[in-house]
Amino acid sequence: MNSQSNNPSKHKPKFFLTTPLYYVNAEPHIGSAYTNIAADAICRFQRLAGSEVCMLTGVDEHGGKIEKTATDRGITPQAHCDEITEKFVELWEKFNIKYDKFSRTSSEKHNKVVEHFFERVKAKGDIYQAEYKGLYCLACEDFKNERELLGGGLCPVHHTKVQEYSETNYFFALSKYSDKLIQFFKDHPDFIQPKYRLHEIQTWIDEGLKDFPISRRSVNWGVGIPKSLEETGALQ
């Protein structure tokens, strides 16, 4: 008998679930466990139902906010990330959360995958350079438009003043995929669940997709821009 036919996992339905990659700017708290508890419960059910399950969780360790926090503490960003990441791992152990893969954005594997992906997408013509001007909230690590802001140019989330930002970055050409996405969702109406989330995405596309920056020259703590481009900065 063929050995492959004796492999029970070959005939099991596959189920993959990923949690957010948790930001390690500060220590985790009880709220940090909410999503992983729900994810763990779903995966346990799927295993009982006979599925071959893979649950991924992990941490997002890059960005200007983490770099600043580490500097304020007088340690390196990597040392800060190592310390806080360990606390997340300890939290999952305390709640008996079982996961299959743990991803760290500071790992060598992650860096290589991102660089490879960047090079492939750029080779297809979907990445280009342009100047970006905008209003940036360091706490959110995100750009804001003026209609989002509170009086005095304050971030609506953190109530801190946003910074004017201008630099030449790499952009992903998201706008060129509008028609393909519209057609994809027509052909696969059940791809996004629940339905109201699909309607949100469709409205977002109908309003016009915009290309967005994927690099920051002013940030050093992140996946470096590929050396072949002979530039400094980090990918977002």
Residue spans of the language-model regions?
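Structured secondary-structure scaffolds
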Residues: 2-57, 109-113, 158, 164-236
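Basic, alpha-helical terminal appendages of large translation-related enzymes
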Residues: 1-14, 54, 58, 74, ...
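Cys/His-rich short segments
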Residues: 124-178, 182
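Conserved short loop/turn motifs at secondary-structure junctions
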Residues: 102-110, 140-141
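Short, charge-patterned binding micro-sites
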Residues: 59-65
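Short secondary-structure capping/junction motifs at helix and strand boundaries
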Residues: 95-104, 122-135, 147-149, 163-165, ...
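A glycine-rich helix N-cap at a beta->alpha junction
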Residues: 84-100
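A charged helix-plus-loop insertion that forms the helical arch/lid used to bind
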Residues: 69-82
